Amino acid sequence: MNSLLIITACLVLFVWAKEGYLVNKSTGCKYGCFWLGKNENCDMECKAKNQGGSYGYCYSFACWCEGLPDSTPTYPLPNKSCSKK
């Protein structure tokens, strides 16, 4: 019975986990990367305490994160376009 409860809880957390491109809150731009696929830098950024993700990799030259909490913003930010100055 306990194992069924644990499995159900894990599935619910997995289904409700957020994913998306990491975004720089000050510029509104995605975190860039060059090595597509498995990428240590993206994985490290996604797993950082202020992001809270479970896994990150490089997709379309930007860091894509999985398992993010709802509080972590992802690209695009509302009312903020990417401004590279």
Swiss-Prot record:
Family: Belongs to the long (4 C-C) scorpion toxin superfamily. Sodium channel inhibitor family. Beta subfamily.
Presence of keyword Signal: yes
Domain LCN-type CS-alpha/beta, first and last residues per copy: 18-83
Tissue specificity remark: Expressed by the venom gland.
Keyword Cytoplasm found: no
Free-text comment on this protein's domains from its UniProt entry: Has the structural arrangement of an alpha-helix connected to antiparallel beta-sheets by disulfide bonds (CS-alpha/beta).
Keywords: Disulfide bond, Ion channel impairing toxin, Neurotoxin, Secreted, Signal, Toxin, Voltage-gated sodium channel impairing toxin
Primary location group: secreted
Signal peptide: 1-17
Propeptide: 84-85
GO biological process, one term: defense response
PROSITE patterns to which the protein is assigned, alphabetical: LCN_CSAB (PS51863)
UniProt name for this protein: Toxin Cll5c*
Primary role: Beta toxins bind voltage-independently at site-4 of sodium channels (Nav) and shift the voltage of activation toward more negative potentials thereby affecting sodium channel activation and promoting spontaneous and repetitive firing.
Annotated compartments: Secreted
Disulfide bonds: 29-82, 33-58, 42-63, 46-65
Domain of life according to the entry: Eukaryota
A Pfam entry, by short name: Toxin_3
